[in-house]
């Protein structure tokens, strides 16, 4: 799959990022991960992101990363394209990018660089180096310390033909509008704020109809129903699902920092696809919060 073919795929449909399965000892559990991917693949996501933020990329050792990406690629070879999360320092991101390409990933999600505050030019140099290290398509993720503006994204688009996507995790509407207007159809644009459904209607109005869904990990039917309602401008269904599910879900998620990942793993366990605990420094939901989530999921009916 060449970068432009990937861009076309990412321009339509719902995207998601499966959680990474760990066993009771905290080690990668490939059998559980295969079961998860086989469960999710038929629901109709356009692409899946392996070892992304929700997949706890930040906690994976290099050898584990290779196992996760290989397992995802092999399992989904005939069903759904796999993009691999990459990040960290520039050299580390390049190593991960080249490994993901070697293992057969169709593209990359370039997560924010590690910790260090950096100038726009420095961040752009980081993105360019990663793009030029591979031939597969790259989606850059503007979030946290990565805040590329429209000017630099335009320059990067000229220098890096395989930079084919922009994912927004900032929620800066002025910046999003300027990027969308300046870059036009050069990129595929993805909504990437936590619990992106809450922002989906607003982002669609900005020209960003595609987003990645965390809740697809445990209520895939509900996630697809919501996406389809957004796509056909069914405002009544969108409002009902936000009121009935997403706002109560946010009440639980927002109780502690890091719960954007923890609550997804809890949901997967409730759904019968236990992915094990989150790794430190994240913490799992309390027993009370777990029961609150279980009751909320029960209201959504069979998936």
Curated annotation (Swiss-Prot):
Keywords: Lyase. Its EC number is 4.2.1.41. GO terms for molecular function: 4-hydroxy-tetrahydrodipicolinate synthase activity; 5-dehydro-4-deoxyglucarate dehydratase activity. The keyword Protease does not apply. It catalyses: 5-dehydro-4-deoxy-D-glucarate + H(+) = 2,5-dioxopentanoate + CO2 + H2O. Pfam families: DHDPS (PF00701). This is 5-dehydro-4-deoxyglucarate dehydratase. It comes from Pseudomonas putida (strain ATCC 47054 / DSM 6125 / CFBP 8728 / NCIMB 11950 / KT2440).
């Amino acid at each position: 799959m060449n970068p432009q073919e990937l861009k076309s795929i990412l321009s339509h449909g719902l995207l998601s990022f499966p959680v990474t399965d760990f066993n009771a000892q905290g080690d990668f559990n490939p059998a559980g991960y295969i079961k998860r991917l086989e469960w999710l693949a038929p629901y109709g996501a356009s692409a899946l992101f392996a070892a992304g933020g929700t997949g706890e990329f930040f906690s994976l050792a290099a050898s584990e990363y290779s196992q996760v990406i290989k397992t995802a690629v092999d399992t989904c070879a005939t069903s759904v394209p796999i993009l691999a999360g990459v990040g960290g320092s520039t050299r580390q991101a390049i190593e991960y990018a080249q490994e993901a390409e070697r293992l057969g990933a169709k593209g990359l999600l370039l997560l924010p660089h590690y910790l260090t505050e950096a100038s726009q030019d420095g961040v752009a140099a980081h993105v360019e180096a990663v793009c030029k290290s591979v031939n597969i398509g790259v989606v850059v993720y503007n979030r946290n310390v990565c805040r590329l503006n429209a000017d630099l994204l335009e320059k990067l688009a000229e220098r890096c033909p395989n930079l084919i996507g922009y994912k927004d995790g900032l929620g800066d509407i002025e910046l999003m509008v300027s990027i969308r207007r300046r870059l036009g159809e050069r990129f595929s644009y993805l909504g990437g704020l936590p619990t992106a459904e809450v922002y989906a209607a607003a982002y669609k109005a900005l020209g960003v109809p595609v987003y990645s869904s965390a809740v697809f990990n445990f209520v895939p039917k509900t996630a697809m129903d919501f996406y389809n309602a957004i796509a056909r401008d069914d405002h009544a269904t969108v409002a009902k699902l936000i009121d009935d599910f997403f706002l109560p879900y946010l009440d639980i998620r927002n109780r502690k920092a890091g719960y954007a990942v923890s609550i997804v793993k809890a949901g997967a366990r409730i759904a019968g696809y236990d992915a094990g605990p989150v790794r430190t420094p994240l913490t799992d939901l309390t027993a009370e919060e777990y029961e609150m989530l279980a009751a909320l999921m029960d209201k959504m009916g069979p998936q």
